[in-house]
Amino acid sequence: MEESITGLITSFGFSSPEAFIALLVVVLAVIGAVIVVITFRPLMEYYPYTYPNARVRAKIGKILNEKQIAELAESESLEEVQNFLRGHKDYAKFVDKYPIEQALDANLAESYDLLARIAPGDLKPTFDLMLDQWDIKNIKSVLIAREAKLNEEETRELLVPYGELKDDQDKLIEADSVQDLIVALEGTPYAKILEEALPDYNENKTLLTLESALDNYYYERLLVKSSSQADDNTRMLHSYIGTKVDIANIKIILRAKADNLTYDQIKPYVIDNGYQLRGWKLKEFMESEDMNSLLSSIESSEYGSIVADHIPEYNSTKSITVFDEALDSYERNMAKNIFRKKPFGVGPIVGFMNKKEIEIKNLKIIARSKRGSSIPSSEIKEMLL
């Protein structure tokens, strides 16, 4: 028996049974290594998300649900809304320190700050850049305050206590003009952005010229920064951010065409290059002769089905709100789909961002509705996202 096995082995070209056994061990080791790689590769992809997602899921659990938001819409006063928020730890420290809208912005900024601190390596540069939105928001608030001739205290109440410029807010508040603000921002990229937009502003005296220049700077960098193709997680985050930019552009152009604005009047307010809507397509949208022409152009784009389903309702009401709501719904559903597809990856992070932004927007709607003349709760609920 032993001789027959030896003969069989040598017939395959092996000099001895030992040589055959050695090769067999090597082959089994290689197969084992392949199995290990196949088994553990997904785990290695998701391992960096273990801690961030634990933190984020805990935060998602604290998001106010629809019932709580509806109850707040039915509250009798702004003070009642504030008292409710004082019962929630994440809001209490801000509600007791700032006016209500400033408190809500601070809570949202804190959420983004958390994401920037805990984001996995491939996502961290994108979330670090997202923190710039608070500097830009504050610069825009100072511009608006100067236009409205608000005093320093009123201006301070508009600012979010976050961002790289947090410690320089006093200098920004003291600026009496756009030129003064540029001087106060010297050494930051925002000084150059405003300086380049200043001639157009001096010509048309429209703050949107300066605000749009800041928005373009932020979103163009964000699209580039998030465009890493490291894995499915980075690609999905990029697609979500890119879609938000595209939706913002579509909304701007829809409003502009509803007001019969021309290409030259619209262009300064549109983010030059979107995600799926490249420059040439945006140009086509802006050059549309009227709303019907614009809707036809949008129908031929990646966002066509969203708009097409609501054209009959628009034709009936002549209100672009139907498109705004449809686009907002598309963005929400996209976040939910990413959550479902990547529950152990970027999904919870994207889901939290979307849910948190909606929560803050709804709370602002309710807070504004409780000021001054009373608005029926039924009308407030219709405004909620």
Curated annotation (Swiss-Prot):
Q: Name one GO cellular component term.
A: plasma membrane
Q: Membrane among the record's keywords?
A: yes
Give a GO biological-process term.
proton motive force-driven plasma membrane ATP synthesis
Origin superkingdom: Archaea
Pfam families in the cross-refs:
vATP-synt_AC39 (PF01992)
Membrane topology annotation: Peripheral membrane protein
- List the SUPFAM superfamilies: V-type ATP synthase subunit C (SSF103486)
In its UniProt record, a GO molecular function of this protein is: proton-transporting ATP synthase activity, rotational mechanism
Arranged from A to Z, the UniProt key words for this protein are: ATP synthesis, Cell membrane, Hydrogen ion transport, Ion transport, Membrane, Transport
Q: Which Gene3D superfamilies match?
A: ATP synthase (C/AC39) subunit, domain 3 (1.10.132.50), V-type ATP synthase subunit C domain (1.20.1690.10)
**For this UniProt entry, what is the primary localization, expressed as one broad class?**
membrane
Places the protein is found:
Cell membrane
Please describe what this protein does: Component of the A-type ATP synthase that produces ATP from ADP in the presence of a proton gradient across the membrane.
**SUBUNIT field:** Has multiple subunits with at least A(3), B(3), C, D, E, F, H, I and proteolipid K(x).
Protein family per UniProt: Belongs to the V-ATPase V0D/AC39 subunit family.
**Which HAMAP family does the annotation name?**
ATP_synth_C_arch (MF_00314)
Q: What is the recorded name of this protein?
A: A-type ATP synthase subunit C
Organism, scientific name: Methanosphaera stadtmanae (strain ATCC 43021 / DSM 3091 / JCM 11832 / MCB-3)
Q: What is the lineage of its organism?
A: Archaea, Methanobacteriati, Methanobacteriota, Methanomada group, Methanobacteria
